């Protein structure tokens, strides 16, 4: 089992060192680069949209995680970098055992991970006492530490969360120690409440590659150097767009990376433009067409927009049964002929109400109030 130590007594300053391999391998002799996969924000234990999909989405997060380990094995990846929030909350012992077993099945890959804000090392965290497999290197220090892989000419640095929020810019003063040709930083944060950082300072910190986590949308802050992998799978309806992982290679202190789409599902926000001639049946048909176009496996939030027949009211719950539709919002307005209504009702409350909003622009707050008021008055008259 892994046993960790710090050599802070040997190093008077700089990051502490944890256990690392000391054997040189054929890798350096053949001059190959170091192959790595960078993931973040896996959020094992989450139950996305549990009210709609029961526990199926939660299981899918585990399945996606297992698949990425399969990629590591198939491609003989040297390093799997996990930049925080492997778990959505404090991990259970049985969950750690399952993850550790999956890691133990990797025959060529070393795993380095940090704890993020969701799975932070609180006082009773099971992370603190868990014994990991020999190929797993958690960087669970409160301050920057590193693990050295001389056979890969690579050192990986990181620190972990001990609280849910850290407002101090802990990464602004970090620096690579220069002990290996390739030096990687695992970092989690980037907003005001989760280790804010200065991109320019971090870029000048001397690391070959900075593997970022916390922001669920994949993005490059600096090409081939400072990358948010994004969540492996979308976790909630705001995680729109594709999700996946970073695949890269390090050689002589420089990285070459590509982002790989990987998630089994995608949250898609879309709109359907409604016309006066539309009925609920025609809208249902268009919702089906939209889902078929973008994929039945994806999860949808659909907004109905435009002008509908004033006599039509859409049953959005019924429309949402057409596929993996999380929500349908009806933002349509009735297609009233206000000039005709006013001419026919000048001397009534309805006519006076329409006159009050004369000249308001379509789409304005006043126009919305006009539509709602007219609809209420007409409904009352019919009642």
Located regions from the model:
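N-terminal active-site segment of His-dependent metallophosphoesterases
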Residues: 4-6, 14, 19, 24-98, ...
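Short loop/turn motifs at secondary-structure junctions
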Residues: 35, 76, 155, 206, ...
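Glycine-rich phosphate-binding loop signature in dinucleotide/nucleotide-binding domains
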Residues: 74-76, 178-179, 293-295
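His/Asp/Glu-rich metal-coordinating catalytic cores
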Residues: 79, 88-236, 242-244
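A conserved active-site cap/scaffold subdomain adjacent to cofactor or substrate pockets
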Residues: 219-279
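Accessory, non-catalytic peripheral segments of nucleic-acid enzymes
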Residues: 254-383
């Amino acid at each position: 089992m892994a046993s960790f130590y710090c050599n802070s007594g040997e190093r008077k300053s700089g990051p502490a060192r944890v256990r690392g391999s000391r054997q040189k391998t054929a890798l350096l002799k053949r001059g190959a680069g170091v192959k790595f996969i960078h993931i973040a924000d896996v959020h094992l234990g989450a139950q996305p949209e549990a009210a709609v999909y029961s526990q199926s989405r939660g299981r899918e997060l585990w399945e996606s995680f297992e698949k990425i380990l399969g990629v590591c094995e198939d491609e003989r990846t040297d390093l799997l970098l996990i930049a925080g929030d492997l778990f959505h909350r404090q991990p259970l012992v049985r969950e750690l055992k399952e993850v550790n077993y999956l890691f133990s099945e990797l025959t060529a890959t070393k795993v380095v991970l940090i704890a993020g804000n969701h799975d932070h090392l609180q006082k009773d965290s099971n992370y603190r006492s868990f014994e990991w497999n020999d190929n797993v290197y958690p960087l669970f220090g409160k301050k920057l530490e590193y693990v050295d892989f001389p056979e890969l000419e690579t050192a990986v640095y990181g620190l972990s969360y001990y609280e849910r929020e850290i407002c101090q810019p802990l990464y602004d003063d970090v620096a690579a120690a220069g002990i290996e040709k390739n030096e990687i930083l695992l970092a989690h944060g980037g907003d005001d409440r989760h280790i804010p950082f200065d991109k320019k300072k971090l870029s000048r910190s001397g690391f070959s590659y900075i593997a970022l986590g916390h922001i669920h949308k994949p993005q490059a802050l600096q090409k081939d150097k400072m990358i948010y992998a994004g969540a492996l799978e979308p976790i909630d309806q705001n995680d729109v767009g594709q999700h996946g992982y970073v695949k890269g290679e390090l050689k002589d202190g420089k990285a070459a990376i590509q982002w790989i789409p990987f998630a089994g599902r995608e949250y898609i926000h879309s709109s359907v433009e409604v016309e006066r001639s539309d009925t609920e049946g025609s809208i249902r048909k268009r919702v089906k067409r939209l889902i078929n176009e973008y994929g039945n496996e994806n999860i949808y939030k659909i907004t109905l927009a435009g002008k509908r027949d004033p006599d039509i009211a859409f049953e959005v719950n019924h429309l949402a049964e057409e596929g993996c539709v999380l929500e349908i919002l009806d933002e349509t307005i009735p297609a009233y002929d206000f000039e005709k209504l006013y001419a026919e009702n000048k001397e009534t409350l309805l006519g006076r109400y329409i006159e009050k909003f004369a000249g308001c622009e379509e789409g304005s707050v006043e126009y919305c109030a006009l539509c709602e008021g007219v609809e209420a008055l007409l409904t009352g008259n019919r009642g």
